[in-house]
From Swiss-Prot:
Membrane-related topology note: Single-pass membrane protein
Functional description taken from the UniProt entry: May help in the organization of the PsaE and PsaF subunits.
Protein name: Photosystem I reaction center subunit IX
Gene3D superfamilies assigned to the protein according to its UniProt record, in alphabetical order: Single helix bin (1.20.5.510)
Species of origin: Crocosphaera subtropica (strain ATCC 51142 / BH68)
Record's signal peptide: none
Gene Ontology cellular-component annotations: photosystem I; plasma membrane-derived thylakoid membrane
UniProt-listed Pfam families: PSI_PsaJ (PF01701)
Record field: transmembrane: 7-27
Keyword S-adenosyl-L-methionine: no
InterPro entries: PSI_PsaJ, PSI_PsaJ_sf
Family: Belongs to the PsaJ family.
Keywords: Membrane, Photosynthesis, Photosystem I, Thylakoid, Transmembrane, Transmembrane helix
Length: 42
């Protein structure tokens, strides 16, 4: 059991969880406001 807790506290797992949460937030934001993420240069 302590091997599982040691695995869950490693950096790659935390980075993947953070990236998953960030991607989910961006996807939901882009679904409700699709034109705010990509501004035209003109």
């Amino acid at each position: 059991m302590e091997g599982l807790t040691k695995f869950l506290s490693t950096a790659p797992v935390l980075i993947m969880a953070l990236l998953t949460v960030t991607a989910g937030i961006l996807i939901e934001f882009n679904r409700f406001y699709p034109d705010l993420l990509f501004h035209p240069l003109g």
